[in-house]
Amino acid sequence: MINKNIIRTLLVETPSTPGNLGKVATAIGLAGGDIGEIETVHVGVNYTKRNITVQVENEAKLESLLDAVRELGGGIRLHTVSDDVLRAHEGGKIQMKSKMPIQSLADLRRVYTPGVANVCRVIEKEPEKAKIYTNISNTVAIVTDGTAILGLGDIGPVAGMPVMEGKAALFDQLAGINGVPILLNTKDPDEIVQTVKHISPGFGGILLEDIGSPHCFEVEERLKRDLDIPVMHDDQHGTAVVTLAAALSACKSAGVDLEKAAVGQIGLGAAGLAICRMFMAFGVKNVFGADKSAEAKERLKGYGGHPVDSLEELMEQSDIIIATTGVPGLIKKEWVRQGQIILALSNPKPEIEPEEALEAGAAYAADGRSVNNVLGFPGIFRGVLNAGARDITHEMLVAAAEAIAGETKPGDLVPHPLDPKVHEMVADAVERAAFASEKSSQKVMGR
């Protein structure tokens, strides 16, 4: 399956005689496009206008597709081409709104001066009351320095804001959490850590997002050590949770015992190392890893994994292959062993296309579009915030992965990312794990 990242909507007019819409669809398919939604916007006396959403791999293929539609003739006309993705981002995707209407002086006195002074004094005397009288305990900072935005790299924090807004929107819709993007105009780990520590009183948790390797490790480790609220780097642990869930589902379908399988991780960056640690936390004994970086391989060794020198060796030794290198086509078909499970997770293009891996004998294969960390972070934070947990442990993350796998339908690797039940189950599993590991402040207080 080729990743098709360019989405456009075509306004196409066709004569009302049968077969003309089929001609348009055929032209789009032959030009390498996929058709999404088709919406009839106007029916004339002898013509019909439709919005047709198409997806293509790149700009060159888009131009070829448009030319193919324009050249159909016979009364078929391409009127406009619009970018609905850009349009959806106009004005941003999130907003901050008041929960209370302020329509009278009495309202004003209750929500602001003079009434608010008494609330401040209550919190001053009993700081724990901030959880009751403010939104702090339900608010998560989404922090980035813009150094590792999706598959785009170091494009800066402002260019990465659409990702942070998307994260905040998902927090709200899937977990009822207030996500606040925090853009940091620094790449210095000390400055990042100090800034987050200074603003942390206003948040119930910290989600680190798209912070590059290797300084992401130091930033997360220091913040987890110094703060008494949960901190998680989503590119590491969110990805690892959903990857473990996908592997659990695949192993269940194939009749494989994951704990006894050999797992090979290609790419030991932020996500790759976290995936290795997640599988080891689950109980997998043989976790192999390959990377060009000697430092990364030493990190893996320190975590208890087994570095290998070549991809061929890793492919030969492993039952389950996971790749997070960002290098398209890195895995050769001839390296694939019969019955392997292959998760090539790099976006926008995977290390091997799922179809190629399956043709070469893989039992299961998927790319990063189906294994999406949106299945993890909303429920994980909902669970830790509900529990009042001060940390996010591997036990909680494994519980989240098992919950996701438990909601996966037969034949799928992971459930639908927008299924509310999935996020509820993840939150419940994480909350239970938090209490079981005695990381919850509320449990310590006797809940």
Sequence positions of predicted segments:
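Adenosine-phosphate binding glycine-rich loop
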Residues: 230, 234, 344-346, 351-445
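A conserved regulatory-domain signal marking ACT and ACT-like small-molecule sensing domains
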Residues: 1-90
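Glycine-rich phosphate/diphosphate-binding loop of Rossmann-like nucleotide-binding domains
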Residues: 150, 157-175, 233, 237-326
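Glycine/serine-rich phosphate-binding loop and adjoining beta1-alpha1 elements at the start
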Residues: 77-261, 381-385, 437-439
